[in-house]
Amino acid sequence: MKSIIINFVRLYQKWISPLFPPSCRYRPTCSTYMIEAVEKHGIKGVLMGIARILRCHPFVEGGEDPVPDEFTLRRNPQKGKK
């Protein structure tokens, strides 16, 4: 199941994402975050990725936000704001 989700995100990165200007406010990008979260936390990583996408909007500062070692739907507290 993990590989299906990861391949779906990679298809998005290759074929859909290049059609639009870069807009992710975080590093790593939201799609890369989703892949890393699924690799690290399995299916729960999908929830983490969706939560990340929902926090990626013009009213947030953005910056570094790597996938945390512990499952959480919040921004990584160790790497918080710049």
Curated annotation (Swiss-Prot):
Transmembrane segments: none annotated. It is a peripheral membrane protein. Keywords: Cell membrane, Membrane. One of its GO terms (cellular component) is plasma membrane. It is found in: Cell membrane. Pfam families: YidD. It comes from the Bacteria. The keyword Cell membrane applies. Could be involved in insertion of integral membrane proteins into the membrane. PANTHER family: MEMBRANE PROTEIN INSERTION EFFICIENCY FACTOR-RELATED (PTHR33383:SF1). Belongs to the UPF0161 family. This is Putative membrane protein insertion efficiency factor. It comes from Streptococcus uberis (strain ATCC BAA-854 / 0140J).
